[in-house]
A protein has these predicted regions:
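Basic- and hydrophobic-enriched, low-structure N-terminal and domain-boundary segments
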Residues: 1-169, 173-178, 186, 223
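Single conserved hydrophobic/aromatic residue that forms the stacking wall/gate
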Residues: 513-524
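Conserved P-loop NTPase catalytic core
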Residues: 468-496
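P-loop NTPase motor domains
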Residues: 27, 144-145, 152-448, 463, ...
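Conserved H-loop
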Residues: 455-456
């Protein structure tokens, strides 16, 4: 950026020198014509007897004559003529009904079919800001004439951003990295979904040097990262237990769903989670998903029934377990087997360690500068339910934290950078994913901003069907299109861009009694 700015300034200086040189050269040349004409008039000025002397084209002679009286008059005349031409062109562009476009057609202001057009300079400055890299603090959206185009800090837009770009369109390099640099400059918190772990490798030290608390939830290599126990945030809250249950069931279905089996497994899982969370004989470090999986796999159905029958009738875990118990023995065996299959990733010792205790505080980003990296796998989805759980609980905890803070906002603004958004899993406890849509529409007032990046609109439609994808995009006031290779995304962006009315000239020939009568027709 700095090199480009220096080159731009150097180009301006060189162009100014060349322009002044050309002006003085032409002024001196025209000044010689004035001088020679004056001499010719003083000698009689008779055509055919004497001739006007030709000017000397030598640059040195022209530059010398530029400082004579006739040279000054010539320079003034050239400046006046040039200014007149510029004023004429500007006035013609402003008041003309039509404007020529660089793409090879003439735009019509009639607006018969539409008035879509690129932003004018005035319109751009009313919504966005132009700044140098050294002074830019807002979200960087692009570059225009050597200046950065940014979303200003005092904007009325909601700051949510949707990025569309196929592989290789530089989503990470051109947009997300710049967003992280701006976040550091503003002193805000960031939570980054990192599918390739490249963001952590490239930017984590920069965050640390700027006083950030840096954590990493590594779902690809759990041994090299911090731990997060999702059950540490329950604290007996049955609604949070329901969210946990729904997220796990919703993100371990492998694209297939059977309400009968899903509901049975959800009831059993919720009962086990609440049993573990409210067991006063268990130390806090054992209240985790690994222990829930141990209860499921180390006890028979009869043993589980005896355990739950010992609970008081009003215990929160009794109701979901009683629903599970209504099934036949064959169905109960199928439910236990199905739930065990969903949670089989907990057989891995590294994953058990990952979910056993918490190094990560979900409310900390709202109180002081934090940078949390969630490293995701872009190859398989067995750990997707953990990333979905993390962001689902994050929205709930941060929103509640903001509501209890002065002004109903997070003291430190929080930015969620969701690269490869579709790899995260379905966020929220609602089976259809509508919880994320609702969260996106209300978190702006809590100073929580979301930037999500997808490769295509089709991906988003598959993850959030039934027009939920439209709600998500509709809640993003900023939409960046970096490139696409599919018709769905291309058609959507084209429709959003609108239609422009252009001028069309055609010639019609009317044959009347075999005598051609041509007519020219212009329209738009």
């Amino acid at each position: 950026m700095q090199m480009n700015e220096k080159q731009r300034k150097a180009a301006i200086i060189v162009a100014s020198i060349l322009g002044c040189g050309a002006l003085f050269y032409l002024g001196g040349l025209l000044g010689q014509v004035f001088t020679n004409y004056t001499i010719w008039m003083e000698s009689g000025g008779m055509w055919g007897q004497t001739q006007i002397a030709a000017p000397d084209w030598n640059p040195a002679v022209c530059l010398l004559n530029a400082f004579s009286w006739n040279g000054v008059k010539a320079i003034f005349l050239i400046v006046v003529i040039g200014a007149g031409i510029v004023i004429y062109v500007k006035v013609h562009e402003k008041f003309s009904q039509n404007q020529y476009d660089d793409r090879g057609f003439t735009k019509s202001k009639a607006g018969t079919y539409g008035t879509a057009d690129w932003m004018t300079e005035k319109e751009l400055k009313s919504v966005l800001e132009l700044s140098t890299p050294e002074r830019a603090t807002g979200m960087i959206l692009g570059e225009r004439k050597g200046q950065l185009v940014c979303l200003p800090e005092n904007t009325r837009l909601n700051r949510h951003c949707a990025i569309f770009g196929a592989s290789g369109t530089m989503k990470s390099r051109a947009v997300i990295r710049n967003a992280l640099f701006s976040i550091i400059r503003r002193g805000e918190s960031a939570l980054i979904a990192d599918p390739k772990s490249e963001m952590y490798s490239d930017t984590s030290e920069l965050f640390r040097k700027n006083g950030y608390e840096v954590k990493v939830l590594n779902l690809v290599d759990p041994l090299h990262g911090d731990s997060w126990n999702c059950m540490s945030d329950l604290n007996g809250n049955t609604m949070m237990a329901q969210v946990l249950t729904n997220v796990i069931i919703g993100n371990t279905s492998n694209g297939k769903s059977d309400h009968f089996w899903d509901n049975g497994e959800a009831n059993l899982l919720k009962a086990l989670v609440l049993y573990t969370d409210l067991d006063k004989t268990l130390p806090p470090e054992r209240k985790n998903l690994a222990y829930v999986y141990q209860l499921l796999t180390h006890n028979s159905e009869k043993t589980l029934t005896i355990m739950f029958e010992k609970l008081p009738p009003d215990h929160p875990a009794r109701a979901p377990f009683n629903l599970f118990s209504q099934s036949s023995d064959t169905v109960k065996s199928g439910i236990i087997l199905g739930l065990g299959t969903r949670l089989q990733v907990l057989q891995n010792e590294a994953v058990k360690q990952l979910v056993s205790f918490s190094d990560i505080d979900l409310t900390a980003p709202g109180s002081h500068k934090c940078a949390y990296y969630i490293i995701l796998s872009d190859q398989e989805t067995s750990m997707a339910f953990l990333s979905s759980l993390f962001f689902s609980f994050l929205f709930i905890k941060l929103t509640r934290f903001a509501d209890l803070s002065p002004g109903g906002r997070c003291p430190v603004p929080v930015n969620l950078i969701l690269d490869e958004f579709n790899n995260i899993g379905r966020i929220g406890g609602a089976p259809d994913g509508s919880d994320f849509c609702r969260s996106l529409s209300v978190i702006r007032s809590r100073d929580i901003r979301v930037m999500l990046a997808v490769q295509s609109l089709g991906q988003l439609q598959n993850r959030y069907p039934n027009n939920l994808w439209s709600e998500i995009i509709g809640n993003c006031d900023i939409q960046l299109m970096l490139g696409c290779t599919d018709d769905v995304t291309a058609d959507y962006i084209s429709d959003r861009s609108g239609e422009m009315c252009i001028v069309v000239d055609s010639t019609m020939t009317c044959l009347l009694y075999t005598s051609p009568s041509p007519r020219d027709i212009s329209g738009s």
